[in-house]
UniProtKB/Swiss-Prot annotation:
This is Uridylate kinase. It catalyses: UMP + ATP = UDP + ADP. InterPro entries: AceGlu_kinase-like_sf, Asp/Glu/Uridylate_kinase, Uridylate_kinase, Uridylate_kinase_bac. NCBIfam families: pyrH_bact (TIGR02075). It holds the Pfam family AA_kinase. The gene is pyrH. ATP binds at K19, I20, S21, G22, G62, R66, T169, Q170, Y175, D178. Transmembrane segments: none annotated. The keyword Transferase applies. The lineage of its organism: Bacteria, Pseudomonadati, Pseudomonadota, Alphaproteobacteria, Rickettsiales. Catalyzes the reversible phosphorylation of UMP to UDP. Belongs to the UMP kinase family. Disulfide bonds: none annotated.
Length: 246
């Protein structure tokens, strides 16, 4: 495992995309938002922001609505996905409010234009905001149905030239099996993109893995509860890194 080596370490990743699932915003709740957890999460983002790291965020909407699940219940898949995209905009605006509360200048850019509440997604505008020291929150996924927010995260990371994708989850890395169900599950320190695909380790979807692989962007999977983001950007802490290792 990767071990932390102290506060004085240099920054390893200067521009990162932080992928936050909607479920992560629920905390221990069955749905909705755990505002204390969100506040702490934004304080953690503030820590790396103050170090000069340029931060993008893609947030999911599963704490409010899951398009794939709704389609199984009879709702048309495309319509379900659009509703899910609207849920991500709600989450993005909540994150923006808590970031601003923690003195972090932030902008929400939506793939579905909603100009009265946020900016439309324009790649050059997003990069401009990052260069000006603003956290950029990408909402509404890719703006297209049938694509997950994991794929949106990989796409935005490629478009904005990020050094890494940080995927915060409920466990501290990628395991050989579900550690909650199998006590013999082994956590991987490092995997290749192909390992994720061939071993069917359902941490990130195949489209997102392909985009990251084609553009050599590492994916770092870590626990939102147990690990500080500031450790991750310094290359320390406990996590699994998915990269071009073979």
């Amino acid at each position: 495992m990767h071990a932390s080596t102290g506060k004085g370490s240099k920054i390893k990743y200067s521009r990162v995309l932080f992928k936050i699932s909607g479920e992560a915003l629920m905390g221990s709740r069955p749905f909705g938002h755990d505002m204390e957890l969100i506040d702490q999460l934004c304080k953690d983002i503030s820590d790396i922001y103050k170090l000069g790291v340029q931060v993008c965020i893609v947030v999911g909407g599963g704490n409010i609505f899951r398009g794939a699940s709704a389609s199984l219940s009879g709702c048309e898949r495309a319509s379900s996905d659009y509703i899910g995209m609207l849920a991500t905009i709600i989450n993005a605006l909540i994150l923006q409010n808590f970031l601003e509360k923690n003195s972090v200048n932030s902008k929400v850019l939506s793939a579905i234009p909603m100009v009265t509440i946020c900016e439309p997604y324009i790649r050059r505008k997003a990069i401009h905001h990052l260069e000006k020291g603003r956290v950029v929150i990408f909402a509404a996924g890719t703006g297209n149905p049938f694509f997950t927010t994991d794929t949106a995260a990989a796409l935005r990371a490629v478009e904005t030239n990020c050094d890494a994708i940080l995927k915060g989850t409920q466990v501290n890395g990628v395991y050989s099996a579900d550690p909650k169900k199998n006590e013999d599950a082994v956590m991987y320190d490092r995997l290749s993109y192909m390992d994720l695909l061939t071993r069917d380790l359902k941490v990130v979807d195949a489209s997102a893995i392909s985009l990251a692989r084609e553009n050599s962007i590492p994916i770092i999977v870590f626990s939102l509860k147990e690990e500080k983001i500031v450790n991750i950007v310094k290359g320390h802490g406990t996590y699994t890194i998915v990269s071009d290792c073979e």
